[in-house]
Amino acid sequence: MKCITKEIAERFLAEEFDIRKYVQIEDAAAEILAKYQWPLNLRGLTSLSEKAAKALAKNQWLLDLCGLTSLSDNVAKALAKHQGMTLILEGLTSLSDQAAKALARYPGSLFLCGLSSLNDQAAKALAKHRGELFLTGLRSLSDQVAESLAKHRGGLCFYLASLSDRAAKALAKHQGILNLPVLTSLSDQAAKALAKHQGSLALGGLTSLSDKAVEFLAKHQGELSLSLTSLSEKAAEALAKHQGLYLTVSCVENLSEKAAEALAKRQGSLLLPLARFSDKAAKALAKHQGFLSLGSFVTSLSNNAVTALAKHQGSLTLYGLTSLSNNAVKAFAKHQGSLRLDGLTSLSEKAAEALAKHQGSLSLWDLTSLSAKAAEALAKHQGSLHLGGLTQTSLSDQAAEALAKHQGELHLGLSNLSEKAAEALAKHEGPLSLDIKYSLSYAAIEAIAKHEGVLSLDFCSLDDAGAEYLAKHEGDLSLNGLYSLSEGVANALAKYKGGLSFGVTNLSDKVAEGLAKHEGDLSLNRLCGLSEEVANALAKHEGDLSLNGLAILSDKGAGALAKHEGDLSLNGLAILSDKGAGVLAKHEGDLSLNGLAILSDKGAGALAKHQGQLHLGCGKLSEKIVQILAKHKRLHWTKVTLPPPSFVF
């Protein structure tokens, strides 16, 4: 049998190759592979010793063990201590009550998609899990199991073919994301029950619903996603009253003018991935005020539809359009608000001149080439300019010089950057973001570091010497393309005098200690896991600390971060335990928990005693919890602006 030996593991870390063909692993090899700082795919393994499981649990990324068809209780206990945020055990066809109890302690996303049935004891155990739980192998739920799993606090995903009224009533008590993507039918009573669910609700498999069922679901208070092929005027009128942050209605084959008029009255973001719609429907939708996305299915528009949509006031997204006539470009240039035409792959000089007159944020994300003349035209645009697709070809030095004259936020996606282009872009006045496909030369880094203001460099590698150059930059610096940091880079950038932002998803103790020496704002918003040691190190950082990528925070981690002197942002947390709320309430700076959606009465009472300013997201918490938190003397409710929901945890 093919076995991962110590030698094979060492070679894998050195040069990386496909190790999915191996069915066994030595304990010593597991210790080595645990150090791998990327998702670890070991789906070929058919068996795993307890010692190997304990070793692999130290891995801080995704761990894929979907080749395992069974799991001993001790191995389950070991894997539950996995330090990464995703554990995939899709091959398991059965699970003992003790193994379920053990895995429930795992705080990250847990995939148990191979389970086709679940007894009530196992369901009760898994209900105590606090991350995202995928049980897509279950095609049906008994009423008892549904009642047990409804107590789960976090995302739930089932591939249920049917749902009884009683089971729907039980699941409605669940708090968090509830995703039922293959459910094809839903009774009016079941819809009435699910409308009471607190959290995001995705029903992507339902192609038809009665008007009564739609009316019930429209009363749902969270984000709602439906995939209806037809929508009556009455149903549209009901959905227009939906008060959640986002409403998605996809797959409607022929949206009538009346239905469009009704939907346009909705106050809030509206996502309508439509394949086609009439000119009259376009005219009606244009009256919607706010975020309007017509998705990627709309690949062409009539002149009348363009004229109508151009009058829309608010954010407009049409990323299915791959080309536009000159008249269409001129019309969209008059649009008032953010405009995303991310499907366009090319742009003539004439079209660039027209779009440059648009006032507001302009995104042409899929543009793969840009002439110097077109760049010169776009540089006259007043507002944020996003050109992220220029990674297929090199941006000429002339085009870089032209774009550098743009006044406002400039976001470019490039394959590389010459020293001359870097020198030109360094003169840009305004926030500058560069997504670099490959690494930069020292000369280019030294040149771009002279940019005055906010600088974002999204590239995947940086050595100590490059970090020394960047440390001389004056202004906030974002390096969100770096998924890992060496101790040398961390120590070099710790000398940086402005705000720092990194895209790392995990940190070693030593790197955390290095970053903690930085004096200024520190953002680690993609950090998905936090050990107690790292939390203790970061707590010593002097300046505001942002950890918005953390979806789960242990009580010990919360206790450590509570000692941080400065503002603390944990906007990714949807759930907070009573103990976690109690220790965070002792934090002496401002505390931001805008994503918090699940909190007990006791936890709310604890947070209400927090002395600094407390930021919470509007519409996230129940009315009862809001009343308890109202006792906080410096409570600030924030209108949460998030990207459109994908409903894929």
Regions found by a protein language model. Give the residues of each.
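A structural signal for leucine-rich repeat
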Residues: 34, 53-57, 76-82, 100-104, ...
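N-terminal segments that cap or nucleate solenoid repeat domains
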Residues: 1-41, 263, 285, 403, ...
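Concave beta-strand-loop units of leucine-rich repeat
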Residues: 14-25, 36-48, 59-71, 83-95, ...
